[in-house]
């Protein structure tokens, strides 16, 4: 587990964030440039469910799945689950690695209409995903006669919290 590695490393109380690096190649081909380096707050890094894996189904982890090591951070976007893991950096500030700033893997800090451009300071790093929902019945465009009662079906989910009710 990631937690075990961090405990073995004797993480200092000043730790705020981790930074994860993989063996990805930068699109420019320049080996001096980092393709992507995501991270998580130290409290999330210490979660029991985060894994550093080297096997899948009793076999060495396939290259396409992140061989030789992959970090798995359940409940957060897949981009945080670093493939081809080469380094974990414990930071005393929010990690500012490649793809942690600007519009990369970020979302508005507050609700906005689609297409609205926001300054970088109004964007936040995507962490756990918000509740999402989908109506599966009736189909889009179905006309329901006024006064007719129907059952609405669908799904609601979230990455780290339980959904216990849905208001329609």
Where are each of the predicted segments found?
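Structured, non-membrane catalytic/scaffold regions adjacent to prosthetic-group chemistry
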Residues: 1-168
């Amino acid at each position: 587990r990631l937690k075990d590695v961090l405990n073995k490393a004797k993480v200092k109380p000043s730790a705020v964030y981790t930074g994860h690096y993989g063996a990805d190649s930068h699109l420019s081909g320049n080996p001096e440039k980092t393709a992507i380096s995501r991270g998580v707050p130290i409290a999330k890094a210490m979660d029991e469910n985060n894994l550093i894996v080297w096997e899948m189904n009793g076999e060495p982890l396939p290259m396409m799945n992140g061989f030789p090591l992959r970090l798995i951070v359940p409940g957060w976007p897949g981009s945080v689950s670093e493939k081809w893991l080469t380094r974990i950096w414990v930071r005393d500030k929010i990690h500012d690695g490649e793809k942690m700033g600007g519009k990369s893997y970020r979302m508005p800090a507050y609700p906005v209409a689609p297409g609205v451009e926001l300054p970088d300071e109004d964007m936040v790093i995507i962490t756990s995903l918000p509740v999402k929902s989908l109506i599966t019945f009736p189909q889009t465009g179905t006309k329901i006669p006024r006064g007719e009662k129907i059952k609405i079906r669908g799904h609601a989910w979230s990455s780290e919290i339980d959904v216990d009710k849905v208001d329609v």
